[in-house]
Amino acid sequence: MQNNSLNLSLPEDFRGVHIHFVGIKGTGMAALVEILFHKGAVITGSDVSERFYTDEVLERLGLKALPFGAANITDDVQYVIYSSAYKLDKNPDLIEAVRRGLPCLIYTQ
């Protein structure tokens, strides 16, 4: 499976840009979500159902982690950022994002 992040440039202005996070409850991911949310990005994300302390961070922003599923990748999603805990060819969100040709960036990028 191809990673669609080669030669990717993110916008300088995140207002209205829809970014989906796979593994949104991770410590680093939640911090990035918070930054991009305050820059005006539209945020969705998926993760396991287990409760983590980062759920409180997400809830303060009015966000909730969705269960993994291809349906999370709607027509509005413009970028996908994912945790290294998930693989492009194994996670249903990522499989759908790649199928649609969306830019997929691993969190560390």
Question: What residue spans do the PLM features occupy?
Answer:
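N-terminal leader/targeting and accessory segments in enzymes
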Residues: 1-108
